[in-house]
Amino acid sequence: MQQSDDKQQAGGKKKAKGIRPPNKLASKVPKQGGKPAHLAIAEAEQRVENLKEEYIAHLKDDMAEVEELVARYTDSRDPKALKLLFRVIHNMRGQAATFGYPLITQVGRSLCLYLLEQEEKGETPELLLITLHADALKVIYREQIMGSGDSISQETVIGLMKAVELKTGEKLLR
């Protein structure tokens, strides 16, 4: 049943009538029962593990596409290849850290920033910097470098970020 508020204004005239819809939320929430927390957590962890396997399979396709697009840009300097490369890298980096590949996220972020900045300035991106980023991604994928990797992996990522910082003036390292 809906409740209403009739407000009296000075002089006996009614002001506005407010209608309050019924609150049915409480009836939708169970008062007891449901899965025990440890089972719900175990199921959620299993789902994440399944998604991780899907991500790794998808990553293989993405890496092949990155390689193809870099080769296409190398041969033709086709700006469409760069736009597609940006899209693929942007998608890869978005989920990489969630599934244990933060280095892919960092390298992808660096390359995406570089490509965006060059486009905004109307400048042609340097092939060498694109290739170095793509090669780093290939190594991370091929060697299955998860987590923050070893010191060489970290130094490589920092080196790529510094190169992009020099080219763009944008801060990547914090």
Where are each of the predicted segments found?
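Generic structural signal for well-ordered, non-transmembrane alpha-helical segments
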Residues: 57-60, 64, 90, 109, ...
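Long, amphipathic alpha-helical coiled-coil segments characteristic
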Residues: 37-83
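Extended, amphipathic alpha-helices with heptad-repeat/coiled-coil or helix-bundle character
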Residues: 79-117
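Secondary-structure edge/capping motif, primarily at the C-terminal ends of alpha-helices
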Residues: 66-77, 96, 115-122, 144
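Short, charged, amphipathic alpha-helical segments
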Residues: 79, 83-87, 127-131, 151-155
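Histidine phosphotransfer helical core of two-component systems
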Residues: 51, 80, 115-131
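Structural secondary-structure packing elements that flank or coincide with functional cores
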Residues: 2-32, 130, 134-173
